[in-house]
Amino acid sequence: MSTYAIIKTGGKQVKVEVGQAVYIEKLNVEAGQEVTFNEVVLVGGENTVVGTPLVAGATVVGTVEKQGKQKKVVTYKYKPKKGSHRKQGHRQPYTKVVINAINA
């Protein structure tokens, strides 16, 4: 059974495994640098460890592959009979991280 972990980053919880590429909220780290996640909620596998609220001493290490923006989400507001309309777009920034190790 492969080892997995649930980490907290960007206000969300993400399930990760070694070798997996995950898209998370933007981190201020250059592409190619290593990033360590210290907020590990759960480490699963042969022996599952659940944190209260975090697993003590557990870390997840990954390498930043790229920084980017998601596809544009367009919002359009329209008021009938008033000639009023507004169009606005938003592209959420993300960071693609490849998980290298889960240290429990």
UniProtKB/Swiss-Prot annotation:
Protein name as annotated: Large ribosomal subunit protein bL21
Organism field: Streptococcus pneumoniae (strain P1031)
Biological process according to GO: translation
NCBIfam families attached to this UniProt entry: L21
Job description of the protein: This protein binds to 23S rRNA in the presence of protein L20.
The entry's keywords: Ribonucleoprotein, Ribosomal protein, RNA-binding, rRNA-binding
Keyword Oxidoreductase listed: no
GO molecular function, one term: structural constituent of ribosome
Entry similarity comment: Belongs to the bacterial ribosomal protein bL21 family.
